[in-house]
């Protein structure tokens, strides 16, 4: 195999080349395409589908513009009888059951379900059923309010980008009008062939001509016919198709324009999304943030799935790409995203594990450090880089070349204007098995610089290969050159054919030509997936393993002599088999004789079962549970470390009988160690066994066969072999490896009892899920159905069975202490109320045993500990990122020894913390984030409220220095309230600064809220929740999205072009969905009113008759034929442009100044995401400014501050009575429902309240009124605004808004009086003047 070229990379791990027969059978399929009409391509303006649809289709007339996987058969799997069931029968009047193995937790042979006479109705509804667990793993649906907010934000963004397109048309229209003014007439439109670069000029000119002759083009059909008469080429073919189909758009001019826009317009939203995609990189962000931003661009772009996968891989971090390309290629973008997130978690876990000693590191992460040759290089080049050796125009494109009908390869394609043809490197073609053809005669290479592709003659060429760039696809033939520095070179012929628009500076290439619109913008032919067309030879066997059917059919294997490994993807695996056979072979006997010789009887030590049972009874001593004070490293959850990140499981059940011959396995926990590869058996060879349909195989032989897989992606014990993987594609490869190994060693599996491609699996009494592990239903049913023990032997059997599963039960030692005390031989057996209560509590604890989540060392840990008179207990807790709630990772408990009872009270409180550090040192030692120890108020006060080391004994101080920990108070409601995170104020401020600097500059890339959130986003939400505990995080998130809306740009971009009625309609539509944020609504309304467009004359001193504003003139332009022919058109147009106001805001008060005015220089930044809290004092000042009287408003309420001053009451236009004026004002405020927070306090008490106000300077009423009266102009001066006219508009607007408030948006609190706004009665002539 040749080394890959330096500038090429595969989007994923390269799939094996199919056999020649498969290639021949599928020949010609690559040319199969699905014909679709040009108008049916992917919508370019996906973002413009929100608000535009609600407001109706907008005409672009300039006159109006100014206005689950397959698996085998499934059946319930029941565990075989065990010793516990046998002992139960002995205690129940001699009832008999079959005797099983000594380990009840290990699933053995599949037998039919037997009725359990002790099983209760609760046990039948046990929550650990597999079907129920799969439902629990389904993602939560997002909140309806969040979905509504995001939909509204997307609608606003759509409208914003649509207005950019209209502004471009307006710019073109202005240029055409100015040229027409100079020449005296409008030019005739040129023939439009379909080039998108000429579309705006063509369609605008046509509309101007149609508007100039309204009598000639009096109906829609004539207008459409005029435009069609000026079409040619591809555009004429598109219009001809509409005429042939008799489409309804022919008689509807606005619909025809919209259809034409969809086909020929290169919209601003698509342009911005493409620029964002090419510049998108993960950088130092979390993968979830990068993926969210990436996914927000996908609907707008509409690129093929494989192109999106290549761009997603290109922007990832180098360390993620390094391990991503070791895994087989995912078949979809969704699977790739899932795999990227899993690899990021694996890498974070690896960084945490590397802080441990080498001997303490788990084996399952060794694959991350295994040397694997690089297959591709993405980080060495970027699309906008240039080659230093090329002195002419050139650029690089991310091009996907479908080297065969089965998969594509992403390469760095050089677009060179000096190359005459399209070239491909010979080494690249050989590496990817590209089919080559010989030319009848050699051709010379003609390039401006022969050093790039060489000067040797060209003899070979390729068949047409599908090439993809963005949503542009074509079939290209390449000439093969021997010494090219680049994998693919696109020359001048390619440039002339497509005529792309090239930005040589940015390295961008976009396609607008009619040829591309007709032939290239269509969905590419899909890759041929051989597994989708395969037919399984056995019913129930997935078709991916149809060639390995002999592993499940021993009779077919006996008839055939095929011992060859699979030929479709497992050749590399089979090459390692002879070396294993050589290691397994005997020195005095050849390989063939050793393996082909059949044994007449299985090899098994005599009396192994008796010795094993004797060792088991000797090993477990109940006295140690009461007196031992040693805290050993806990097996669970360390046992399941290798399952972290596994989401796909396949359980294979071996045929025959598997016997255990080891003398060192005494307990159930010893079985777990062997099954999960924690204790690998050192075997150099094994004795042959009888090759038949149901053989008897020693357990050590199975482990020897799978010795290089156990602990990495396989666990095995008895007849069960569990294969697990991170991704679906990797899982196929792993299962195939195991089946090929079994076929080579003549080990057969039962197809009926095997389960393929599941998300949960049962193994050794456990239910394994992607999240964690929980107890099997049969284990729980056995314990909960156990009858009341009548003898010490019966109680001992129960405790021996339940003891290995103590890690799944909280406070196991505390619950079972009375039962263990009865097992002591020096005391008579007694069963009283205390023992019965402990027995019932043990059943209850197993029935409620939770799912133990996989601990993640990269995340923060929480310790919850406790101690009683007889035992201590601890719980290892983490936070679930998806739900935000606490999850348990492990439990530990033991009895307190007699020596520890004499310890001091302080040492007794620290004792469970020390024990937890001992048993979970693998996870808690050298953590990056501090371990938070949850204590109640009493313990927190006694432990100095800061550090435990103050009260530690001398011999414990050195031990505790190995751990980074801190203490905090235990939350009151442990089930509902999430655990708090302890952060410093400086860290929160730093996070806010980072969030402000890293805010996306484009709203089109804002991510939608998902169930999975990045750690950074969670930290920010939690810190905000700590600052504002009374507000939910969801509302802060929604307001955060609204805060990112560029109100200034929206107003200055398109609101300035509308009339007053249109502005009112747009604003009402926009704010109707934002009513439940009344504070934000008030500020937005104020901003709109302050940005009044007209400059009015300064009013004189207060007089009875105020100045009347001049009538607003219409800015519409009507071009009639008579006007065009006259000589006064220039004068008319000049006057029109002179009277037109500027297109930018003139009287604009910055939002920062306004927020600083009412909130002070600092708090407005802090409250940016909370929403502005407008107090009654603010509303009363507005009433005073606009001359409005306040009265009660139904359905609303105010929240007075304890230090709030009395709001002023407006008596007239200029006279204000403040708080210090008269005592009768206080009574009047009570009647009106406006409270000032002082109530009936005395004047001295009120003065004290004024003294308690913040020391920072707050604006006085006079400053506020002066600031509102004069607003800033463009020239830097101050312009007075017309109070009466502005007040009238504000009153109408607020009244219409508040009357449409929904009852459900009102806060759920007892109704009481609020405040409303009411217009003072005025004279009829004043009203008429204001109208």
From Swiss-Prot:
Q: Does the keyword Membrane apply?
A: yes
Compositional bias of type Acidic residues: which residue ranges? 109-123, 128-143, 569-578, 1015-1024, 1320-1331
**Compositional bias of type Low complexity: which residue ranges?**
19-30, 992-1001
Please give the function described in this protein's UniProt entry: Plays an essential role in capillaries endothelial cells for the maintenance of feto-maternal interface and for development of the placenta.
Instruction: State the name under which the record lists this protein.
Output: Retrotransposon-like protein 1
One of the Pfam families matching this protein, by short name: RT_RNaseH_2
InterPro entries membership: DNA/RNA_pol_sf, DUF4939, Peptidase_aspartic_dom_sf, Rev_trsase/Diguanyl_cyclase, RT_RNaseH_2, RTL1-rel
Q: Per the record's keyword annotation, is Cell inner membrane included, yes or no?
A: no
Q: Name one GO cellular component term.
A: membrane
Task: Report the domain of life of the source organism.
Answer: Eukaryota
Where is the protein localized? Answer: Membrane
Q: Which UniProt keywords apply?
A: Developmental protein, Membrane, Transmembrane, Transmembrane helix
Which parts of the sequence are annotated with region: Disordered? Answer: 1-123, 128-147, 556-595, 971-1033, 1309-1331
**Transmembrane region positions?**
1070-1090, 1117-1137
Bilayer topology term: Multi-pass membrane protein
